[in-house]
Amino acid sequence: MKTGIFYAVGVGTEPLDLTLRAKQVLETAEVLVTPITRAGEPSAAARIAEQVVSFSGKEIIPLLFPMQKHLDYRERLRGELLQPVRDCLQAGKRVAMVTLGDVSIYSTAAYVQQVLEADGYATEVVAGISAFSAGAAKAKCSLCERQESLL
């Protein structure tokens, strides 16, 4: 029986952007998945989260996602890349993957969540503050008003 739960967690663009929900999920997670673009380099999303939530005592699983065109993430995720995450979920653990900004906008965590859900695991998406929203706020700029469309 697949008893663990996977959370895809948006951490915003800076520590003060971390939502209360994201903080709560990261604090209670037993395992943290941190996306990296190069082996041996720290995760930008983890650096943000770590300034708000202690990673002490948590199992850390770095997942390598090189920034390359034409890379089929879903195929890699269906293979052995996610096996350590699946093992933790099979053991009933709470697993959270951090991602910059919001999970729903150009996020590897969204691919991971979709693959794990298709595999039958319980998943949840925790929204974060997107870069364009944070940027507009810093610039004191309204992105759309009245009848205008954002898209």
Language model features with spans:
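Class I S-adenosyl-L-methionine
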Residues: 1-122
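Class I SAM-dependent methyltransferase SAM-binding "motif I" and its flanking Rossmann-like core
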Residues: 101-151
